[in-house]
Amino acid sequence: MDKERILTPAVVFSVALLHLAMVALLWQAHKLPVIESGNVIEFVDLGDFGGGDGAPEGAGAPAAPEPQPEPEPPKPVEPPKPVLKPVLRKRRMRIFSSLRKSRNLKKSRNPKKNRNQSLSRKRSLSRNRRKNRSRKPSEKPAEHPSNASAKADSEQGNGEETGTKRDGTGRGEAAVNVSVGVKGEHGEGAGSSKGNPLRANGSIPRPAYPTLSMENDEQGTVVLSVLVSPGGHVESVKIVKSSGFSRLDNAARKAAQNGHFQANAWTEFKVPVKFELN
């Protein structure tokens, strides 16, 4: 019973709220529209009533005058070119043509001499070709005689030797002459005597003639000092006398470093290398 008493007022209250909401909705639907009042502005064209200066209606401002084109500046007058060079050229051409004609006449007058000269040139070229073919491509090193006599003092260790020279040819028309001589011991220890002569020999490969030296006609003789240890190993190469051209000196030095020597003691070889063009 208590529960029913509590529910009845709540139901009544909710039903009342629903009726109020329905009434409010119906009231808003039947409302009349409210007309809003505002200021109205009208625009009037004053040009239809004529201008203030007495001109007819629609007459505007006067048109601006058209700009006149500027006159073109006068072209500079070119001075006349002098006519002197063609005359000089004609004279020169005439002189050269006359000289050529005179030379051709001289050559035609002596046909036998011209033929002889051409034949001699052909013969010289054929001889040079035969010489180049006869030369072997592999260059042999210059040999030194095995018996090189040495005379030295027992206290100082200085000696004098003699070596033979052999001519050789290089590449093409170049010739390189190499000869090897023995100077004696380096100065360490006792020197040799007549009863115990120093025996040493050696050879170096023929150095290649530098191409730039051949083109510039560089010739000369290089004297090298080659120090050889016991066993034939080249220890150092020095230039005693230069040829005057660094390329020739370097070529001779490289060839001496690759030389083959036979020595029982420290031996200094003097190697002259001659570069010449045939």
Curated annotation (Swiss-Prot):
Periplasmic side stretches: 28-278
Annotated region (Disordered), positions in chain: 51-203
Biased composition (Basic residues): 87-135
Location of the TonB C-terminal domain: 194-278
InterPro entries: TonB-dependent_transducer, TonB/TolA_C, TonB_C
Cytoplasmic-side segments: 1-5
Protein name: Protein TonB
Organism annotation: Neisseria meningitidis serogroup C
